[in-house]
Amino acid sequence: MTIYNFSAGPAVLPKDVLQQVQAELVDWHGSGMSVMEMSHRGKEFMGIAAEAEADLRELMAIPANYKVLFLQGGASSQFAMVPMNLLRGKASADYLNTGEWSKKAIKEAKKYAAVNVVASSEDRNFSYAPTQDRWKLDPNAAYVHYTPNETIGGVEIFWTPEAGDVPIAADMSSTILSRPIDVSKYGVIYAGAQKNIGPAGLTIVIVREDLMGETVAGTPTMFDYKIHADNESMYNTPATFAMYTAGLVFKWLKARGGLAGMEKINREKAALLYEALDATDFYASPVAKDNRSLMNVPFTLKDAALDEAFLKGAKERGLLQLKGHRSVGGMRASIYNAMPTEGVKALVDYLHAFEKNHG
């Protein structure tokens, strides 16, 4: 039986990548060492790190005036690092509130700045994203922060906000590398790796050079982007094995047509699943159609009393980790880059079969 893992994160990794990791685990390229054993300053690992950065730059077409940082601490640490680095003498920042992760970012930013919530979708249980004509931007804000894809709620924003000269900061943890974006429109992009990049423990930050070097008073050394940039992400020991695995994922993506190729596949996968959910009233998708995520698909059963039976039957078919987040309930299928189309088709087949037996 083929197993398909729909976990929101840590999440499915490409089978090809896992097999390469397995083959190289004990002896990387004849070095006599596992990547886990290498000095992060040795020539072997320095080469791995440089190649990973070069491949990510190529995949995302990252301009030369942006630094790529391989950090730790997850997006949750970035909720503090963004204001610490981007306030740059200003007192306030703009935040869009579209779900649980937006709320966490807002809560943390309030420790360092006056937060202006430009718009919120909490009025409809975070089931949509407010269009920009509804935003109340502050021209004096240090930056504008938003979450393009809310992992829990499955709400995605497919356009990039316009804020004039005010830098845009984006938590792309669950959407990065799923489709092309114009990096030059952002001041800072950050993402925990454990959803669409690689193993947990790695956080990728892409930051425009002119936004580094002026931190708020009392900023810890480890929270200063410029320190990490000046030390090529090796101020402290980085998450070496996670960086190596991420580098293999970058090569896997390049071999599949890059981000344009992945977007085509991801849209096809998402369409299959949403069409199945929309075809019946036995299931429901709570998200407005314009904001339905390509990566995280929450859905509910008409009768919540059937939830446990649904999950049990799914597990018996090898469909794992479909339980929704504890804060919202229901189901959630995360269909990241590494989820093959066959996995989505298997889930759709199960949706039909379960309804036939219980509808």
From Swiss-Prot:
Subcellular localization: Cytoplasm
Gene: serC
Binding site for pyridoxal 5'-phosphate: 75-76, 101, 151, 171, 194, 236-237
Main location: cytoplasm
Protein known as: Phosphoserine aminotransferase
One of the GO biological process terms: pyridoxine biosynthetic process
Listed CDD domains: PSAT_like
EC number(s) reported in the record: 2.6.1.52
UniProt lineage: Bacteria, Pseudomonadati, Pseudomonadota, Betaproteobacteria, Nitrosomonadales
Annotated InterPro entries: Aminotrans_V_dom, Aminotrans_V_PyrdxlP_BS, Pser_aminoTfrase, PyrdxlP-dep_Trfase, PyrdxlP-dep_Trfase_major, PyrdxlP-dep_Trfase_small
Positions with a binding annotation for L-glutamate: 41
